[in-house]
A protein has these predicted regions:
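HhH-family (HhH-GPD) DNA N-glycosylase catalytic core used in base-excision repair
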Residues: 1-198
């Protein structure tokens, strides 16, 4: 696949761009994985997260939310001592906390996917102007979801982190219009065009 988005600069980045980024996620395990990875990325490059992704997966049992929600101090120490793993105790504790909050959303809405996709009426959003270089770090939608998640007890879910999550999990299609992925996603999923300020 020819990559026309400008940011994939390594083969690993390119594979992530081509086969994951922006493609709608409708299962809770992958939603939880992407949310955790975005939270871990705070202050780091995304390439760092991709390079450590398999180690992170192993540490968190492939993001089994029910398992992670029950982690104790012993698990935190295990993760902290894993070679190659990120050593931020606060972020590790936040993932455990977020797993518990994630479960509460599942209990209330039936699934996390039902909860988060309801914010876009179960459609992928396409914002006018984003593919012309006017892509924001956050927007009104990510700010609204961030506030709601924080109210529900989530941590490390600021508006910028949530905007990145919305892009990664396909609630927003921010591929460039000339990128093959842009049309692939639009043709396979219900979409709605938004103005830049919506």
């Amino acid at each position: 696949m020819k990559v026309t988005c400008s940011w994939p600069t390594t083969p690993l980045y390119q594979a992530y761009h081509d086969y994951e980024w922006g493609r709608p996620i409708h299962d809770d395990q992958h939603q939880f994985e992407h949310l955790c990875l975005e939270s871990l990325q705070c202050g780091l490059s995304w390439l760092t997260i991709l390079n450590k992704r398999e180690i992170i997966r192993q540490c968190f049992e492939h993001f089994n939310v029910d398992a992670v929600a029950q982690y104790t101090e012993t698990d935190i120490e295990r993760i902290m001592s894993t070679d190659g793993m990120l050593k931020s105790r606060k972020k590790i504790e936040a993932i455990i906390n977020n797993a518990q909050a994630f479960q509460r959303i599942q209990d209330e809405f039936g699934s996390f996917c039902e909860y988060i996709w309801a914010f876009t009426n179960h459609k992928t959003l396409i914002y006018e102007g984003h593919s012309e270089g006017r892509m924001p770090a956050k927007n009104e939608l990510s700010t609204r979801i961030s506030k709601d998640l924080k109210k529900r007890g989530f941590k490390f879910v600021g508006p910028v982190t949530i905007y990145s999550h919305l892009q990664a999990s396909g609630l927003i299609n921010d591929h460039g219009k000339d990128c093959p992925c842009f049309n692939e996603i639009n043709e396979a999923n219900p979409v709605v065009y938004m103005t830049i300020d919506d």
